[in-house]
Amino acid sequence: MRKVTFILAFFVLTGLNAARIRKKTAPGKPVKKVKSAAQTQPAPSYSGIQTYRATFEKDLYVKKDITLKGLHATERLTFTRPPRWNILEGSEIHIIFNHSEALLPSLSHLSIAVNNITLKSVTLTKENSVSTEIVLPIPPYILEDYNVLSFLVDQHYTLDCEDPFSPALWTKISKKSYILFKYRPISPIVNLGVFPHPFFDKRDYGTREINFVMPSIPTTTTIQAMSYVDFILSNYISFRNVRVNIFRSASETDKDVILVGTVKENPEILKFASTDELFPSKGVGVSPGTGVIIAKNDPRNPRRAVLIVTGVDPRGVEKAARALFAGSKILSGQRSIIYEVNEVDTLKEREQKGYIPLKKKFELSELGMVDTTVRGFYAKPIDINLFTQPDAQFFPKGSRLKLIYSYSAGLDGRLSMIEVIINQRSVVSKLLRNKAGESFATLDVPLPTWLLGPRNHMTVIFHLFPINFDPCRRISDKQIWGTIHASTTIKLDREYFVEMPDVSLIKFSGYPYTLWQNMKDVLFVLPDKFNVEDIHNLLLLVTYFGKETSPQSVKFKVVTPGMLSGPDYTKDYHLIAFGNESNNRFIRDLSDRKYLYITKKGIKSLKTFEKKKKSFWKRIFGGEEEGITTEVIKAYDYDSAGFLEQVISPFNKNKTVLVVYSRNTANLRYPLEALLIPRILTKFKKGNIIAVNSSFEVRSIDVGKKRIVGKVGFFKKLRFYIAKHTLLLSILLIIALYLLYKVVRAIVDAYKKRRLMEEEEE
């Protein structure tokens, strides 16, 4: 009885708060936008009531408008309630939609629900067939940590014979729709046992900030510890946009802050923790190398969380930073004292979450996939990512897909089929002919390796139609289904080698610097006398690497040129240097030895190859026609841009040196910030030099000598080229056999002629 009373009360409430509908005045015009504080997303002040606009596109990851097709269609989106928000009355869902003008209003409706509670049912009329916005109040009490926003549409265009696949049956939900949260910030619960919360939580929205308070006199070990903390947090925040800030004092911001360093290096620590809190017995008798991690609420502002990573000495600070990777396994409460860190890192080179296994033959279950079933006329495509490093070279022969699938009984074998698409190209389809259905059927498909690259997307689509399908009769489609089994196997015959240097490969998850996920073979080389800007630039690059990896530990090193003593400290590492000849001796040495194209005097005269349209023979045999052109970079570009230049390491031919270069230190951040902006990163094209200016205009220049980098023997490389150029070699073989035939024929003819002459003489 109480449940019935509750439901009646809810409908009365929603009736009193009827949704307001704003319509367009004319077709083709955009929805009128009302500017508000929520649109500009100002930084919250942690006082009073705040608002946040969570858009479908940016916050709910809806990349394109949602289209609901057919007589009946549903779509679900998941959204969260951030743990540090107390949601208030006045929160709203703004849905922007349009639909086919052919729909009958008496039979067509769009219903919107949150957590199975219907907020509104809208009749689909000609008036709202153009882009229309409806505003739905959200009762705060129906929200949970994770919520489901559902759209259900019933749509019809005629009272007579009706085709369920008619193009007139559609309703579209715009990706510009959004949820407007009205909330009051609340104090977080701070406990190292749930790290990285509250410094990051998957339920949060928007760009996440990592705010460091700069040590006043840091050592390279402390800077390395800061980098470790940044790397770890960036890894947690990999699917969100990240902004890294450095403040000289915690009072410069009211956001969560992170303080790294010894108390001597970073005296700001004492504003949040006394000596008694930091070390037992005020540090008396504590052994060198001991680290301490403290997480607590700011005593002066409980809504702010503070993370302190400190130690008796810089080595203890670094140890505390590495301990954050273990998280709740070894950390608890608001303080943890770190004596030793026993890191267990089982990842091998090239092993990375979300990437295909290293072995040539694997099952989809090894990618984390489970048996997946889809139903109905509009069965959703089953998407499978097949990611690999950019130096993977696939052999044309021997790569196969053995698709294992099942489908229901009662399918029309003339119309129902399964289709496999790789990188948006259909490669095979097969009719589902068995009226009784099939279990664990197989489809063996040779994989066209010429379609494959570093980022491969395989899509399997079931096109399902019930037996005796009649568009003029209403037939249920929920009983027809298809399943892809996780035991499906893929064989990809491949080796790993690539032409270097090529800076653009860094856009593929930081290649080659992240082949080891803990980056144990990477050295970051700061200027001799580094400053705050240099440290910020380092953290920007580390943030990108952290977002692109899935490590179990962190092992890269941060050094200055004076620490690069002896070949053993450089030959086994990729080196990444920041600055220019004036402030970084290592860069100056590379420039003096003529390893770099970018110099303090400008940029060398660059001759590049301009790609032209391929001729008939080039299309058959591969390769590109080239014409020499001169690449000119204006002085303005040189002065105002930041550069990434990559060269083969002079210490190890299988390693590289990446120079982050600019005449002006402030310009160094442009290419580093570009790495954190996906739409800019995609503009990185093949080249050993990439320039990015303040407008994020990207220029790629491909000059200098190339070499094959990779662990591959001569015969394997020969096998690859033979397999890749089978057509060319076949034609050359035919030509060679023809020439051999002509030579043999000429010899035989000459021999016959000579014999004939000898016989005539006799």
Spans of features found by a protein language model:
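Positively charged n-region of N-terminal signal peptides that target proteins for export
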Residues: 1-4, 725
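Sec-dependent N-terminal signal peptides
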Residues: 4-12
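Sec/Tat signal peptide C-region and signal peptidase I cleavage site
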Residues: 15-18
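Solvent-exposed alpha-helical segments and adjacent loops
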Residues: 20-762
